[in-house]
Amino acid sequence: MSKNLTRTPSVSARRQEAERRRQEVRRRLMIAGAVVLALLVIAIAAFVLTQDDEPEAGTEITGDRPLAAVDPAVRNNYYSEPPAMTIDTDKEYEAVIRMADGGEMRLSLFDDEAPITVNNFVFLANQGFYDGTTFHRVLENFMAQGGDPAGTGSGGPGYTFEDELDTGFNFDRRGLLAMANAGANTNGSQFFITFTETPHLDGLHTIFGELTEGDDVLNALTLRDPDTATEPGDVIDEIVIVEK
């Protein structure tokens, strides 16, 4: 009588099959890991590129701007003392100078290096003090000066405050924002933006910002010497502060 015999794999064959399966699993895991890593790299690259193309816009500070409706000449000597410190030096500030003709200049403010000056500028801008004033003094290859409610170069907010000269900045390039003054520690509301390097001003005027956008608008400002001009300077519609 015959018997049906079932052959079973040898121990060696079973081990080889198990090893083959383990290697197949490892291979699939490695492929899956590589795919995930590649997708992660692509996602990070896309995020970085998006951040570069679309920088944080920040928030425009809006409020009543109580002086915006007051004739600029009436604002002359409107205040009796400098403003209290209200800016947050842990944040970043920008100023957007919007011209009446539609042009716009954007400036980064150096609140870490010149907090008192930036605080003053932010306060006046938010009050509407600069709305409707002009760039009353614009000299070729030198600077464009504004911020005077009288429009003559002699006006101001009614107070003065000290210089901040130890900021680490020098007048070594175009587009620097600085305070105009009548001597040491006589800052008020008037400011200027340089057209070129002006090293002879080093140590005399507080630098508190720099132009980041709108160089063409700066370049297009009408040249004007207040001592001889018969027409008013280019009008500033408003200066808006952006907080980041």
Say what each PLM segment does.
Residues 1-244:
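Cyclophilin-like peptidyl-prolyl cis-trans isomerases
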